[in-house]
Amino acid sequence: KQMEKDGVEFNLGAKVKSVKDNHVYYELNGEELDVAADAILMAVGRIPNTEGLNAEGIGIEFNKRAIAVNEVMQTNIPNIYAIGDVNGKVMLAHTASHEGMVAVAHICCDHADMNYDQIPSCIYINPEISSIGLTEAKAKEQYDNVKVGRFPMMANGKSLIEGTTNGMMKVILEGETGEILGVHIYASHATDMIGEVSVAMSSELTADEMIHAIHPHPTVNEALGETFMSAWLGKAINSL
């Protein structure tokens, strides 16, 4: 919505047919269209880069294009582990790093399963976007009682000081216990704040505990506590 306000036009569901000179030719709703541009940025996704590993040659099993691994990163050959993009799980640098920790722990006779439900995701735009856990739609598919709270950044003191009031925070909870199911942040410093939620989820903290964690003032992340208030109590101090 903010990008639309800034003049960005979206053509969702379009099928790109070709690119020639400075024109992109595409199909949308059965109509052939084109758009001229000074620059074209293509984002076509990623695939596991397993070329040159000779993994199949030594008998390692694949799951489609990726190397198949268990919860401790072992392949079907017990003394061979696969971490990072080659296993096709969650293709993020911090995921690969933690997968490495899990694999080394298992090699050293410790055990810690990889939990892909609690991996933060970050988008480095302005304002930033970060998220962890379930979306509201997914939470309502999996749980009978879901509470959702939102908090606008225009009600946050530090954001007002910095002049970065675009954005909001959203917290999704299990309605009976206050279990944290998901958190989504669209705000300045969003990628720095999501780590707090990662710690909270891995420590199985509840909404009540997050509300009573004292955040310093003025900071952007004190808005996080208010978003938990909004979700769990139905109201936040600075957005009444």
Predicted regions and their residues:
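Short, acidic, Ser/Thr-enriched surface-loop or helix-capping motifs
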Residues: 5, 70-71, 174-175
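Short gly/ser/thr-rich secondary-structure transition/capping motifs
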Residues: 21-27, 60-68, 154
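Flexible, glycine-rich terminal cap/loop adjacent to redox cofactors
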Residues: 108, 125-135, 140-240
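FAD-site-proximal beta/loop scaffold in flavoenzymes
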Residues: 10, 34-106
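Short acidic/polar mixed-charge low-complexity motifs
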Residues: 29-33, 177-179
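A short, glycine/Asx- and small/polar-enriched loop/turn
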Residues: 20-22, 77, 162-167
